[in-house]
UniProtKB/Swiss-Prot annotation:
Pfam families: Rotamase_2, SurA_N_3. This is Periplasmic chaperone PpiD. It comes from the Bacteria. GO terms for cellular component: plasma membrane. InterPro entries: PPIase_dom_sf, PPIase_PpiC, PPIase_PpiC_CS, PpiD_chaperone, Trigger_fact/SurA_dom_sf. The gene is ppiD. Keywords: Cell inner membrane, Cell membrane, Chaperone, Membrane, Transmembrane, Transmembrane helix. Residues 1-15 are cytoplasmic. GO terms for molecular function: peptidyl-prolyl cis-trans isomerase activity. The chain crosses the membrane at residues 16-36. It is found in: Cell inner membrane. Chaperone that functions as a gatekeeper on the periplasmic side of the SecYEG translocon. Facilitates the translocation of precursor proteins across SecYEG by interacting with the translocating substrate. Also plays a role in the release of newly synthesized secreted proteins at the periplasmic exit site of the Sec translocon. It is a single-pass type II membrane protein. Belongs to the PpiD chaperone family.
Amino acid sequence: MIEKMHERTNSVAFKVIFALVSLSFVLTGIGTGLVGADTSAVKVNGTTIDQHAFNTAKARQQNVLNAQLGERFWDLLDTPEYAKQFNQSVLDGLVNDELMRQYAKDLKLGISANQIKSQIVNSQIFQQDGKFNNELYQHTLRNNGLTADGYAAIVNEGMLLSQIQKGIVESDFSVPVTEALLAKLLLQQRQVRLATYPIAKEIANQTASVEELQKYYDAKKTDLVEPEQLVVEYVTFMPKDIEKNIQVTDEQVATYYEKNKADFVTKGETHLAHIQLANEEKAKQVAEALKQGTDFAMLANDTSTDSLSAQQGGDLGWTKAGIFPEIFEQTANALAINEVSEPVKVDNNYHIIKVLDRKEDVALPFEMVKDKIVKIIRDELLLTEYSNISHEMANKAFENSSSLAEVAQIAGVNVQTSTQFNREHIPADLNNEKVIKALFNGELRQSGQNSDALDVGNEREPKTMFVRVRDFYPERVRTFDEAKADIEQIVKHQKAEQLLLAKAEENVKALNEGNAVNVDFNEAETLVYAKRADNPILFKTVFAMQKPTDKPTYQVTHNQQGDVVIVSLEKVIDGKQEEFAPLASQLKQLDQTLLRNDLLKDLRSRASVDVNQNFIEQLK
């Protein structure tokens, strides 16, 4: 999580969010937390992480995975096993973050409001004509739906965890002798020539008698199993199957508009300015100066403790309802344009508020929103009808459990039939974890009964499926005739490999003895240990071979294709420390990850983590 937070703080996306400074800095300084008290999801050393925080983190992670995996993510999330793992990963992430937060507190690490303000004021995102633009920053905050305290906590946490990350980075080091040894081994080069004996070519030259095939069959009969197979009837039902049946009348649209006019308005905005003061006495002095005619902007610039808005004469820009604390907005709403309030206490500061201008709510005309309302009503009616029909189909599947014909008739769709298949080769239409579980883990495959309604869609595209096993073929041992062709290939492969290995071993013996032998080696090539993943079988042999002295060393092995290979090791060149720099940064990052994981493991071992099991169970 620290690495991820560290990456986020250096990404463009995070810098945009980071620049959306919390209005709590304007009003009260650093915010106090993401959310208020709520039913807990988990308690970490007595500190509550509520269900709202869990759901927010879950939604954020869903968005990330949806962007990476698309529809496949929602299909995975529909499976109980994956959903359980996903929810646990979200919970673990929140617990880890809280442990790090508490660890930072124990270390007396902290981020001041001035540190965050400095970052924001100097951010290019909110610079206009080379200066910080308060209205631009306020506008971006509103557009992103961020609350003051919520964003303050995010910024504070991000900078705090970055401090810990910096500590981990600075505590991780390696001595030159270690780097020299790693360079020598990881970047070691081995110059080889290879002689390849293709297995496929030799297999084509082999024969296998019926007696040999029968002998293999008798010895390996229990391994020659035909897995259970099914032929499945199924019905798939989606909202689009009944979309053409949904009609929306003009009367419905007009009625909806009248009942929901409040939803079809351009929300009003208020242009505000304020002077923030540390105590009541100072606030009264400034209020009196205003009554005597002193300019509001000048007083804000000279006396306001909110340094950001003070530079703008107290200007907070245009704001919508819900941005400021309730008492602040109530006071502003009671003012006329150009009217100034008496000092009002908001948290630990006093504010004198001025309304510079106001834009009232503007109702959107019916014709402008008509198409939108039609879609809203159509979608609601469609989902309602889809739900009703799905329920009716489920009842019919239960009442007449030996056929799907009437189930399909209710929805106006067809019963489809699969080809014969086993669990390793699921047809695309049935390749869903819920369907596979219903077919293979229960009694359906032998009972011939209809399944329950299976929800195989996702939040954006609902889909219901019913399945029934029409034909069931149990697992059985294949007959000799059925397995004969496969056995023939196996026997021929074994013969070919034995022959090639014997030939290669004989040639290696001759080469080691210095005798002339006809081996067709290819041109020399250089293999580097750090790239062993390219051909692990070959590399394992090459880098385990004895180093050559005055002549090459030889050994028999295989390549990834199964061919038999003679390796001639010509030369070994150790890696140099100066070439190690690119790898060093990767290894350093890995070491830091391991250090962070060890730290979390230690913190968890000493922590009290109380999970709300009832809440977690409800998520399944």
